[in-house]
Amino acid sequence: RVYEVYKILNKDFDLIINLQGDLPIFKKDLLEKTTKLFSDDSVDIGSAVCDLEDSEINDNNVVKARVVLDDQDEGFALDFMRTVDCTKNIYHHIGVYIYKPNVLKEFVSLLQSKREKERNLEQMRAMDNHYKIKLVKVGHNPPSVDTIEDLKKIRLHFKKNNF
């Protein structure tokens, strides 16, 4: 869908941001930090992670990323999964993706990979086709709407904040 909009707009962009629809609230530093990942020319796709809460370890609705972070809290993704055996170098993956336009164009033309189908995780298609996904750790986890209860919480937040 993001690529379809990009084609319709018919404009040149340095980067294309895909913010997942289940993240209705986020802080601007999420996009600022993720965009800055592209100062490294080897990055194909940028995304973000945050600390994994104990309650999320066994939650299959929470996508996890394995990454070794450097002193700038950045690193290239090693894997994405819904279930984990150990929590070393495992973080909560946040559903924001920033693409170089040529990478997005190539990505949408690729067939689903075996691991993408098995895990129901689109980013595995990129990993399996050797795209470099760089992650940055942010200090907050934007609320995600995955269940009816989540939706109720977000609606209450909007109501309290006059949205």
Put a short name on every predicted segment.
Residues 26-113:
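Conserved core of the sugar-phosphate nucleotidyltransferase
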Residues 90-163:
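Conserved alpha/beta core of the MobA/IspD/sugar-nucleotide pyrophosphorylase nucleotidyltransferase superfamily
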Residues 1-21, 25-36:
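Short phosphate-binding loop-to-helix
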Residues 11-13, 40-44, 131:
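Short, high-confidence coil segments that cap the C-terminus of an alpha-helix
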Residues 8-11, 60, 155:
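One-carbon transfer enzymes
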Residues 16-19, 46-48, 107, 134-138:
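Short beta-strands and strand-loop turn motifs
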